């Protein structure tokens, strides 16, 4: 079952990205290095509710 998730920057807290994930294959929270436009650099983004 695929669900929509939001990725938030860990440094500034902005929710910059929306994506989907398969809860059966990835039950834990996703962490990705993504670009943050506010900070103008690549930062760690975590899945939020």
From Swiss-Prot:
Keyword list, A-Z: Ribonucleoprotein, Ribosomal protein
Keyword Amino-acid biosynthesis found: no
Q: Which Gene3D superfamilies match?
A: Ribosomal protein L33
**Top-level lineage group:** Bacteria
Spell out the molecular function terms from Gene Ontology: structural constituent of ribosome
Q: Does the keyword Ribosomal protein apply?
A: yes
Give GO cellular component annotations, separated by semicolons. cytoplasm; ribonucleoprotein complex; ribosome
Task: Please name the SUPFAM superfamilies in this protein's record.
Answer: Zn-binding ribosomal proteins
Write out the GO biological process terms. translation
Q: Name one Pfam family in it.
A: Ribosomal_L33
Family listed: Belongs to the bacterial ribosomal protein bL33 family.
Which PANTHER family does the entry mention? 50S RIBOSOMAL PROTEIN L33, CHLOROPLASTIC, LARGE RIBOSOMAL SUBUNIT PROTEIN BL33C
Q: Which NCBIfam families match?
A: PRK00504.1, PRK00595.1, rpmG_bact
The protein's name: Large ribosomal subunit protein bL33B
């Amino acid at each position: 079952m695929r669900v929509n998730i939001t990725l938030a920057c860990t440094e500034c807290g902005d929710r910059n990205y929306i994506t989907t994930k398969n809860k059966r294959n990835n039950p834990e929270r996703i962490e990705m290095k993504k670009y943050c436009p506010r900070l103008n650099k690549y930062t760690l983004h975590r899945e939020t509710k």
